[in-house]
Amino acid sequence: MSRGLGDVYKRQILSVVTILVIGLGISSCSDYLSVERFFKDRQSEEKIFKSKNFTEQWLAKCYNCLLETNLEITRIGYSTTNFADDMIFNESDGAVTYNAFKFGQYDNTWTNNSYIRCYEGIRQASILINNIDINEELSEVEIADYKAQARFLRSYFYWLLLRKYGPVPLIPEETISIDEDYMDMSYPRSSYDEVVNYISEEMALAARSLPEKRDRQNVNRSTKGAALAVRAKVLLYTASPINNPRPGDSDKFSDFTDWQGRMLMSQTYDES
């Protein structure tokens, strides 16, 4: 009799344990499938730009987009400037080698990431420029400086794109919502002159609020001289025969058009 009761108790205990295990499993599955926890640490743009610390982090991210394939000077094998002279490089380098560039044995895939990083930086800079004025922890001088730095960076990213890809799309400064239709986000290429004029005007505007020099802690940030120097270089390149066809050479870029047949390079010599 007692043995029968013992079996009953065991079955009851086993049933309770089974129910608890199933309940815990359902609960854990519910927690696993819940995505709310992934959004708890996401900040709104308003919260970010009301905070001095978060705003500085946002600006730092803009500068971060100058790294990797956007570096002007870097270690051997990772920048085209490394192959601009007759210095000897180790051919066992795992990246693109000296001879690959010397003999033209490369394609567009090597610099594709630069295109992505530039437009990422352009978007980051535009968002900062459009929102930083709500910050109450920064002084007016700091806000003007941060906006000017972002403006410099945005223009510089376009300069990098122009040098590598020629005429590129100029993205609206109010930025593009990811919720828009794909076709609404597909902006056509702007002409070479349009991109140059944008860079020139934005660099001149940035120079008005940038300081002439910075302290040691901020020595790598943009300055008035940097903005004016980039602007001068852009205009110098634009005035060269490569981009400004001389009389008698007007058909040089006659077939350089977009899908709508719009000319992307000027066909008229500009003395200015």
Describe the predicted segments one by one.
Residues 218-228:
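Aromatic-lined, polymer-binding surfaces characteristic
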Residues 10-27:
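Sec-dependent bacterial lipoprotein signal peptides
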